[in-house]
Amino acid sequence: MTYTKWVKLYKGTKIDYDNAYGVQCVDLIKHYIKKVLGATPQSIGNAYQYWEKRNSKYISNLFVPVKNNKYTIPKTGDVFVRSSGYNSKGERTGHIGVCTGNGNTEYFYAYEQNSGGTGEGMTLHRHTNWSSINFLRPKYQYITAKSGLHGYSKRKGNKHNILIPYASKIQIIETECYRKEVNHKTYTFDRCMYKGKKYYI
């Protein structure tokens, strides 16, 4: 299932994926992993632990970590992980959600549930405080741009080497590994694998 279809079908829905502890933010992520990424969700703990366990076999098979910095702009389908946050019992929980791709270096939007312990279903929220937030980018993705996506074999190349067609499957192998300034605007590139070759996209 595509990210877009997932949002359309489940926006506003209260998802209790594991039928335990009611509607939790991590339930939405398990649902996302199952429906969109096509993987079997595992229980790894509270929300903040998705980042702390980013190098575990389970997480690293699904995601590539994106450590937040001043150039970071979350992409569609990225999972944000907030390390801060506690429940009513004083237990550290953190928070987690799925980014829309709308935003810049100052704010971003994401779908999440049980924000602030309210028990709400899948709802869109705007985030401006990034102090304890990092991201997990899905390792395997499909090109969503109808016109395709330009791939560059070299960091300093000004001319693209390939046009990766719409709906093609790529593997992200490194995130935010290269930055390029064009007309006073900084663009950040990931490195991917496509048909056995590596490209900056």
Language-model region placement:
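A short macromolecule-binding patch
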Residues: T118-N129, K197-I201
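Short, polar loop/linker segments at the starts of domains and inter-domain junctions
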Residues: D18-Y21, Q42-Q49, E120-H127, S153-Y166
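Short, solvent-exposed aromatic-acidic interface loops
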Residues: Q113-G117
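Beta-loop motif signature
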Residues: Q141-Y200
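Low-complexity, Gly/Ser/Thr/Pro-rich intrinsically disordered linker/tail segments
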Residues: S132-Q141
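Short, compositionally biased
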Residues: E91-Y107, K185-K197
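Secreted/periplasmic proteins that engage bacterial cell-wall peptidoglycan
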Residues: M1-G103, Y111-E112, Q171-R179
